[in-house]
Amino acid sequence: MEAKMNKIDTNVVELEIKVDAKDFNEALKKSYNKNSKKFNIPGFRKGKVPMNMVKKFYGVEVLFDDAINACIDKTYGVALEENNVRPVDYPQIEVVEVGEGKDLVYKAKVTTYPEVTLGDYKGLEVEEVSYEVKDEDIEKQLADMQARNARVETKEEGTVENGNIAVIDFKGFIDDVAFEGGEGKDYPLEIGSGSFIDNFEEQLIGLKVGESKDVNVTFPEAYGKEDLNGKPAKFEVTVKEIKVKELPALDDEFAKEVSEFDTLEELKADLKEKAVKANELRAKREMEEKVINAVVDNAKVEIPEAMINREVENMVRDLEMRLGQQGLSLEQYYEFTGSTEDKMKSYMKENAERKVKTDLVMSAVTEAEAIEATEEELKAKAEEVAKMYSNGAETEKMVDLLLNAQRAALELDVKREKTLKMLFESLK
């Protein structure tokens, strides 16, 4: 086998690969053996037609396709390795010369991984990020805990007020025609929650049990249903019951009921400690994003369209999987959002391009700094992942499984973490 490489465009090369006539003839024999049962010639049993008779009656060309594919499978990868070509996508194959007793010559047009030109990535200046935990943050958490543990009781007298729960029957109309999905019975609507269309809940304030009212609203332009987007609607609403939330007192007894602590002060201290840790993690992630963005912005790389398209497809598959976990399909998602597959892919393209560039640039930094993952680091990362999904004896099994089946992914994670650490340590 011989292979020559020509660069024909940015990130595109053409390999001209020659397979010796002897090897091609062997491939023809294998093609004959593979397809022998398909040939029917009078005087011969099925599957027993000699190769020379097949060539005579059908023409040797009938064996070419499988023979050519076998030769490509055997030589294409070798040609890539010999010429240090890293392909992004499947090649475009063109057969140049083919014939029995002749060399097979074919061309493979290959889109390659782009070359990254790194800019400054050490000694960068990035504004520090930090978040303070305020007393009102803890008070809000306590208020949320109160609301979750509130008793709900029927309001015997009075009218609907903000914060009440109005149990309602409703039916929606557009142009005096009832629309699908616009009807509900005994629906508990918390006034002020913002769970219904803007200005719906406010119009119920002041109503008594048994009273009805026409509530006029306008659906948002991007409501998610084409037949409702931006349209005015009328809802016939009847209040059937009014309920109020009785909040528990914020005291030591409350702390004992909702946590493992004996006093309210201990609960507050725990909430604050967790909030501090959460803010530190949030700040760290934002700092990481700032550093990565700076490194990526300083680098230059021409990204092949094939890489962007592949990332878009990955994003679509990821969305489809997440929707499936909620019992939804992509088609339902398009209907709810008023989108289409083409619109969604177009929307995703910018983010896909940024992600591809980020991955390429960060990998280039890792390579430039000769950052490697040790066996100990890989095992530690595997243990970290395993503990998230298992415990006890199962953890050890999962560690072994990860080290074998997901080694490349673990290595990528470790290298990325070490690269980020190096970038942080070099900040001014």
From Swiss-Prot:
UniProt keywords, alphabetically: Cell cycle, Cell division, Chaperone, Cytoplasm, Isomerase, Rotamase
> Example GO molecular function term?
peptidyl-prolyl cis-trans isomerase activity
Write out the catalysed reaction. Answer: [protein]-peptidylproline (omega=180) = [protein]-peptidylproline (omega=0)
What EC identifiers does the entry list?
5.2.1.8
Q: Where does the record say this protein resides?
A: Cytoplasm
Hey, which family's this protein in?
Belongs to the FKBP-type PPIase family. Tig subfamily.
Record's comment describing the protein's domains: Consists of 3 domains; the N-terminus binds the ribosome, the middle domain has PPIase activity, while the C-terminus has intrinsic chaperone activity on its own.
Q: What is this protein called?
A: Trigger factor
